[in-house]
């Protein structure tokens, strides 16, 4: 029997990582409401931590998003994911992962049949990045490893950004690295001259 190895998964999983207050919720609140991200079916949003920003469940329902919360790392199990799959029958899953949990533990899990990680995105608060890198480097490395997009926000000081890019590229050469300040995306060409 021939198996189509290029078959797209039935349920695409988007894994969002980043430390607390790195902008995960803000990014997802924006993205989930955009026309380009809309699908016909249901999106299951799994929250693994509560940050400063919150989701409005009624607002999210307008975009076909249902929210489930996992309080403790021990509760995020293969069985729980199966239960959520049966309960919601999602077309897409977005996981806002807890920044203090090892991402590798989730990546080792057997996902429900038809689910596959489509994209891993990491958000970083540039104003606290150096502190996290110094004190929690192994967790940061896990977050960034295999990420397709690393988004640095709150980039008010442009001087260290080229070094931040190098820190990411060492771990995840394929990652697209984007820097944003309060006005939006920082011109990457300007970083070359810093």
Sequence positions of predicted segments:
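Nucleotide-state-sensitive switch-loop elements of NTP-binding domains
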Residues: 3-17, 22, 26-119, 123-130
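C-terminal helix of von Willebrand factor
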Residues: 77-81, 163, 186-190
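Phosphate/Mg2+-binding loops and adjacent switch elements
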Residues: 92-179, 184
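Conserved small/polar residues in nucleotide/adenosyl-binding loops
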Residues: 192-194
């Amino acid at each position: 029997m021939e198996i189509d190895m290029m078959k797209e998964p039935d349920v695409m999983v988007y894994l969002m990582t980043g430390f607390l207050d790195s902008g995960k919720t803000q990014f997802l609140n924006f993205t989930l409401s955009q026309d380009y991200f809309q699908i016909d079916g249901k999106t299951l949003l799994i929250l693994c931590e509560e940050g400063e920003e919150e989701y409005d469940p009624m607002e999210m329902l307008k975009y076909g998003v249902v929210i489930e919360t996992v309080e403790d790392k021990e509760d995020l199990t293969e069985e729980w994911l199966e239960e959520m799959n049966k309960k919601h029958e999602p077309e897409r899953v977005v996981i806002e992962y807890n920044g203090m949990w090892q991402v590798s533990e989730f990546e080792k899990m057997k996902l429900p049949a038809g689910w596959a990680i489509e994209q891993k995105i990491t958000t970083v608060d540039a104003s606290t990045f150096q502190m996290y890198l110094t004190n929690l480097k192994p967790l940061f490395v896990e977050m960034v490893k295999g990420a397709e997009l690393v988004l640095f926000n709150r980039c008010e000081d442009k001087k260290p950004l080229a070094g931040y890019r190098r820190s990411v590229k060492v771990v995840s050469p394929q990652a697209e690295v984007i820097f944003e300040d309060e006005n939006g995306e920082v011109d990457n060409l300007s970083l070359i001259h810093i």
